[in-house]
Swiss-Prot record:
It comes from the Eukaryota. GO terms for molecular function: transcription coactivator activity; zinc ion binding. The lineage of its organism: Eukaryota, Metazoa, Ecdysozoa, Arthropoda, Hexapoda. Its main location: nucleus. The gene is Sgf11-1. This is SAGA-associated factor 11 homolog 1. It comes from Drosophila willistoni.
Amino acid sequence: MSRTIVVKNPRTSGKDEDKAQIPSQDELPSGSSGAKTTNQIISEFRALIKDPIKLDEAVNYLYETLVDDAAVGIFIETRQLQKTGSLTALEGTVEETNDMCDLPDCDIFGMSTAEKTAKCCCPNCERMVAAVRFAPHLQTCLGLGRSSSRAALRRLTVSSRSSSTSTGGGQANEKSTDDEDWSLDSRPGKSTKNSRNKGSKKNQKNKLK
């Protein structure tokens, strides 16, 4: 037995309904196992396109049905997202639009593009130095550069030599003064001893006489 499919067109309401005869499962050829073969699909397609009026109506109905189903599905999904609160998370937050700046001597973000000589304070000498010259000034001021390190080393050697000579000269002066004092103290002692010895010898001779 064959089944009859009725194709309804909303535009042609009240008119005769178009009917297309589709073979039933019993009428299928043996070996098809209930599934349509490519030849059957092609034959049905050829049967439909023989009558251009029926073909146009079927295509229009199919197109309208697909559009309605897609629209209804979108509406239902949007309604469900709105109920569950997932619509806001899906859309995301609206980013703030930054207006472009048209002021003179400024970029589009409003930052000034005018050249300014920035100055920095030296932590060693507390002088205001231009930012361009701050690094070499700090290098020379702290004695960290090549030339400045040599100068600092030279200063250290000179200061160490001067300190050593000053301490050595003081010790030499102290030694010389000590020697002079000792020589002065020792000379009268020798003379007194000699005089005492001479006197004692003379006294002994006089006594012997």
